[in-house]
Structure formats: structure tokens, C-alpha cells
């Protein structure tokens, strides 16, 4: 059953520019009106989220409905991001759904994602993006 949640902004957090480009194209195919923000590391993503809330009255910075989060990045990992995100949630205008998106085939990563209360979905990176497409279609109404 399709959800009635609207998807107006997605924040992609991934250190790989090719993956970001690929995921951006997949999302735009599904919904050309969705605002896509990209951060190539978790530190900048946290800064974006906090500043978005701090300056929302002065500057239109869209708050994400969905965060697509890579697990393995230099510096702060996706798991570290989730820990820090939990600390700043009260400062945010709205909470985003977090989906881990990774090429990791380590079963521990899948298990950690399933056990983490902040991660709604673990989406394997695929050459055709089929997992991401179907999950977005199942969970969000396109505008």
C-alpha cells in the first residue's frame, strides 16, 4: 500500500560523487519537483541540518523529508552521523526519515541497520537503482 507522505526534499550524504549523481538522477526520474541536497560528508550534512533550522526564517533552506545515508565515508561514518543526528533532533524543525544506502555486503551492516531505531530502511546500492526506486514509490507520494 502506498503511503500518503509527500516528499519535497531529500538530503543525500555520500562521499562518492558518481553515486550522488546516479541517485540524484533516479530521484529526478521519479519526481522532477523534489528538491535534492547533497553533502559529501556527514559533518557538512549535520552543519546543513542545524543551519537550516537556525536560519529557516531568513533563508529558504529546505528541511529534508528523507536522508539517504552512506555507511562508509572518510571521517564520520554513517553510524557516527546517526549518533550525532540523535543529539540535534530537538533543534530541527522536522525529523527526516533515514535510509541507509550502501554497497556493503557485510551482514553486520544490515543487522545494525535493522536494529537501529533511526534507520527505516537499508537499501543496497544497485547498478540500476531498482531498490531505491521501489522503496521511494512504496513510501512516498510523488508530487
Short names for language-model regions:
Residues 38-51, 78:
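Helix N-cap/capping motif at the beta->alpha junctions
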Residues 73:
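Receiver (REC) domain active-site loop signature in two-component systems and cognate sites
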Residues 1-11, 17-32, 60-63, 124-143:
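Non-catalytic signal-transmission and effector/linker regions of two-component phosphorelay proteins
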Residues 25, 80, 94-99, 104-121, ...:
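Alpha4 helix (beta4-alpha4-beta5 surface) of REC/receiver domains from two-component response regulators
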Residues 53-68:
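Active-site beta3 strand of CheY-like receiver
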Residues 79-92:
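Short amphipathic alpha-helix used as the core "switch/output" element in two-component signaling
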Residues 67, 121-122:
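Two-component signal transduction core modules
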Amino acid at each position: 500500500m502506498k503511503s500518503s507522505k509527500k516528499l519535497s526534499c531529500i538530503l543525500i550524504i555520500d562521499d562518492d560523487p558518481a553515486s550522488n549523481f546516479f541517485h540524484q538522477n533516479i530521484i529526478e526520474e521519479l519526481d522532477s519537483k523534489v528538491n535534492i541536497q547533497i553533502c559529501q560528508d556527514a559533518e557538512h550534512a549535520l552543519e546543513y541540518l542545524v543551519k537550516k533550522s537556525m536560519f529557516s526564517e531568513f533563508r529558504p533552506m529546505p528541511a529534508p523529508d528523507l536522508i539517504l545515508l552512506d555507511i562508509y565515508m572518510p571521517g564520520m561514518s554513517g553510524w557516527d552521523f546517526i549518533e550525532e543526528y540523535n543529539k540535534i533532533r530537538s533543534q530541527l524543525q522536522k525529523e527526516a526519515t533515514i535510509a541507509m544506502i550502501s554497497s556493503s555486503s557485510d551482514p553486520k551492516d544490515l543487522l545494525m541497520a535493522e536494529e537501529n531505531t533511526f534507520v527505516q530502511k537499508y537499501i543496497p546500492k544497485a547498478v540500476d537503482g531498482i531498490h531505491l526506486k521501489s522503496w521511494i514509490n512504496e513510501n512516498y507520494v510523488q508530487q
